[in-house]
């Protein structure tokens, strides 16, 4: 009856999916030793077994008797059970790519105190990885749970807009016209880069304008005007750089100014310290008024009693 229970339990274990606890990495041609130890050392081990997922039984062992299944032999897989059946070990020789997979060992135990047919078991799994390259052998002991690296995102210190609001009005310059004797070159500028950096102490705005060139002659004219505006809390600095055309014509040009308006509004918030100061000043004023009232009352009362005493005499 006990053997039948063990057989049925083994069949159910073969088709179950235990979670791997140990991972071993080896190269092709090496030998891999897989071992597991049981936690329950009080019960009697009736039989131990090794099988390979998904449904391949390798061997059944009872003491020194080993029975192999599914074309496995002792020449390929050797079995050992040292330390009085506390540990069971198999050694897979001359590894090939087909030997990779998850191997599971199971202990079938019965209680030594109760005369029952109840069978208890423990199972442990090992994942064997067979590397096809010439890398060194690595044995990795895993805890059974996946671990992903921690990531953290930090917000830059200069982005802090909780106490201010910033409004920009940018007027792009109008067309630039170069008047020459025999030709007219019209250059249109459009704003293409607006970069704003806001800090707790200052705000800066960079405006760079460039655009296409409309040429009515057969020669190439290159004319680039860029504006860089830096706005701080106290001043605005505007820099203009102009590159002349390919013929080095230094004709005067008219450029509409770039208007940048920077409006900063700070909304102050009262802290607890400010409220404490206000409350302290108010309390001091009230106490001073009470003290003055008490002194005045005492003086007036003293004079009144003195006056009544003199009248009685």
Curated annotation (Swiss-Prot):
Its main location: virion. Glycans are attached at residues 71, 114, 163, 182, 262. Residues 18-121 form the Ig-like V-type domain. Disulfide bonds join 36-105. Residues 1-16 form the signal peptide. The chain crosses the membrane at residues 278-301. Keywords: Disulfide bond, Early protein, Glycoprotein, Hemagglutinin, Host membrane, Immunoglobulin domain, Late protein, Membrane, Signal, Transmembrane, Transmembrane helix, Viral envelope protein, Virion. Glycosylated; contains phosphate and sulfate-substituted glycans. O-glycosylation is required for hemagglutination and hemadsorption activities of infected cell membranes. It is a single-pass type I membrane protein. Residues 17-277 are virion surface. Residues 302-313 are intravirion. Pfam families: V-set. It is found in: Virion membrane; Host membrane. It comes from the Viruses. Induction: Expressed in the early phase of the viral replicative cycle. GO terms for cellular component: host cell membrane; membrane; viral envelope; virion membrane. Belongs to the orthopoxvirus OPG185 family. Prevents cell to cell fusion by interacting with and directing the viral OPG040 protein on the host plasma membrane. The OPG185-OPG040 complex associates with components of the entry fusion complex (EFC) presumably to avoid superinfection and syncytium formation. Via its interaction with C3/VCP protein, protects the infected cell and probably also the extracellular enveloped virus from complement attack. Heterodimerizes with OPG040. The heterodimer OPG185-OPG040 interacts with components of the entry fusion complex OPG143 and OPG094. Heterodimer with C3/VPC protein; disulfide-linked. This is Protein OPG185. The lineage of its organism: Viruses, Varidnaviria, Bamfordvirae, Nucleocytoviricota, Pokkesviricetes.
